[in-house]
């Protein structure tokens, strides 16, 4: 009976360690983001591009038209969560792996306690 319990716990331990590794293996790699202060790349053969028209100030047209503020029930309708295609970031993956390792340690401690209890009686 104890060997069957130990075999089950070992199988649970192995599956707890391997499941996060298998599930996080197929995450696509995202391109490296550029820094905000890096200069923009210019097309080959062209000089710097002027971003503003010389000598012209924007004309003030007055205050903007008032808009209807959304009610409290409409505040979440405009927000779109997780538009990145459903992939997890590196922090979330690390948290999942750490949680799996902690769960494995708890299961291992329970196995040790159970084996000591049954071997003592």
Curated annotation (Swiss-Prot):
The keyword Cytoplasm applies. Residues 28-84 are annotated as: Disordered. It is a single-pass membrane protein. The keyword Cytoplasm applies. It is found in: Membrane; Cytoplasm; Secreted, Extracellular space, Extracellular matrix. Residues 25-92 are extracellular. The chain crosses the membrane at residues 93-113. Pfam families: DUF4690. Residues 114-121 are cytoplasmic. Disulfide bonds: none annotated. InterPro entries: SNORC (IPR031500). This is Protein SNORC. It comes from Homo sapiens (Human).
